[in-house]
A protein has these predicted regions:
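N-terminal subdomain of nucleotide-sugar transferases
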Residues: 1-61, 262
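Carbohydrate-associated surface elements
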Residues: 42, 186, 206-209
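Membrane-proximal helix-turn-helix segments that form the acceptor-binding/catalytic region
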Residues: 117, 124-128, 161-182
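A short, well-ordered alpha-helix in the C-terminal region of glycosyltransferases
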Residues: 392-408
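Nucleotide-sugar-dependent
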Residues: 250, 299, 306-312, 320-341, ...
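Conserved donor-binding/catalytic core segment of Leloir-type glycosyltransferases
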Residues: 234-250, 256-259
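A short helix/loop element that forms part of the nucleotide-sugar donor recognition site in Leloir-type
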Residues: 54-57, 216-233
Length: 425
């Protein structure tokens, strides 16, 4: 008889949040070994909620064999702190209520989202739920990003007493867990630093992944790629793409000023250079306003792509950005790297030295990296990618990244690691 695992997931399919996609892959990939239940919010990543989910009730569903409890949350604006916090608190409160309905569980799995509350839900679940034999379930806390460190790095909340309480709560979640899993070597260092002079909680590191059966290199003549290029005016262009959350943690407001210097640029083989931003987030309006004000015809904004079209938008680029703001090293790990490697494209990275993905890019040799805030180095790297647009070196970089991914960072490899460490608890 399979053991039971409960997963707390603020976002889950069809929401396009990267953490939601990771947890969907995990939930569905673990079904050979576990009976999986997920507590998540109704689809709401964009801030809007479909009419069919607006009744204030719990929605019980099944998706690809995974049992879901979707809890009601209010709509929100990504630009409004108050409405975002209200949304997060609603999910936290409703998820606690549903916890009492899920029945016996052998394992509780949660990630570090929503900030602080993700870990607290795991602690709550371990306390309230029992196994079939009446014992407390094992609690696995997967830290995708550290808070309050991330909040502090971005200045999203500046009240020190609030941050002190938040740190205390998240350290408690780590202590109460039976296993902490981080997604980068630098995040392991942060865990050790958090507990300097204390007993460090049991922990391991497992990289995130990409589903190599859904995201893989395509021939540029593929219909889906041509369709996207035609739709957004990208035909015969040299495309430097940012794909993902256009939010607080990436210094995009600084990078757009560097990009402005390349307005109207061409490659040696005569193609116009275009900077494409694919996605949405709290900084999008500021970027679009800046681009409009400065007449930056070389910048194009494209909405989030459905999961079945993501392969085409990622393949449409010649080069991909992978960026984090200063202070994010050891705090968060940009999952977009795995998608870039998945489609065998070179990486234009802005990452701190010693961060997991910076180390991977340099170890593999699949891109150019500069430090956050070093805009001259960013400018030099952009220029290098433009000057070498017709060079075979770009394809070689992309292929090195893809080869490494296929051998080390596929969905099946990483999920087997999760299954193995959880089963041993």
């Amino acid at each position: 008889m399979k053991k039971k695992i409960l997963i707390y997931a603020h976002y889950y399919a069809p929401d396009k949040a990267s953490t939601g996609q990771i947890l969907q892959d995990m939930a569905e990939g673990m079904q050979d070994d576990f009976d999986v239940t997920v507590i998540c919010s109704v689809p709401s990543y964009t801030g809007k909620i479909d009419e069919k989910y607006k009744e204030k009730k719990i929605y019980e569903e099944s998706l690809n064999g995974v049992k879901l409890y979707r809890v009601p949350v209010p709509e929100f604006s990504k630009a409004s702190k108050k409405s975002r916090i209200k949304n997060l608190l609603a999910y936290y409160s409703q998820a606690k209520k549903v916890t009492k309905k899920v029945g016996p569980q052998d394992y509780i799995f949660t990630i570090s989202q929503p900030p602080i509350m993700g870990g607290m839900l795991g602690v709550y679940g371990k306390k309230k739920i029992r196994t079939e034999s009446g014992e407390h379930p094992k609690f696995i806390y997967c830290i995708q990003d550290y808070n309050p460190e991330q909040i502090l790095a971005t200045g999203y909340v500046k009240l020190k007493p609030v941050l002190k309480v938040a740190m205390s709560l998240d350290k408690k979640s780590c202590r109460k867990s039976d296993l902490v899993i981080t997604v980068g070597r630098d995040l392991v260092d942060t865990l050790k630093n958090r507990f300097k002079g204390e007993e460090v909680p049991e922990h391991t590191m497992i990289n995130n992944w990409i589903d190599e059966k859904q995201i893989y290199p395509l021939d540029p003549s593929e219909h889906g790629i041509l369709e996207i290029k035609q739709k957004y005016g990208l035909e015969n262009k040299y495309i430097i793409m940012y794909s993902g959350n256009i939010g607080l943690y990436y210094d995009l407001e600084g990078l757009i000023k560097v990009i402005e210097k390349f307005n109207g640029s061409k490659t040696p083989d005569g193609r116009d250079v275009v900077f494409a931003f694919v996605g949405a987030g709290s900084v999008l309006d500021k970027l679009t306003a800046y681009v409009k004000k400065h007449n930056m015809d070389s910048v194009v904004f494209i909405p989030y792509q459905d999961k079945d079209k993501l392969i085409y938008s990622l393949n449409a680029a010649d080069v991909h950005w992978c960026v984090n703001a200063k202070g994010i090293k050891g705090v968060s790990c940009p999952s977009k790297f795995y998608g870039i490697a998945g489609v065998a494209k070179p990486v234009l990275a802005v990452l701190e030295k010693g961060s997991e993905v910076e180390m991977l890019i340099n170890e593999i040799g699949c891109g150019k990296v500069s430090e956050p805030g070093d805009y001259k180095a960013v400018e030099d790297n952009i220029r290098w990618f433009i000057d070498n647009a017709d060079s075979s070196e770009l394809a070689e970089m992309g292929n090195r990244g893809h080869d490494y991914l296929v051998k080390n960072l596929t969905k099946d490899i990483s999920i087997k690691k999760y299954t193995d460490v959880i089963s041993k608890l």
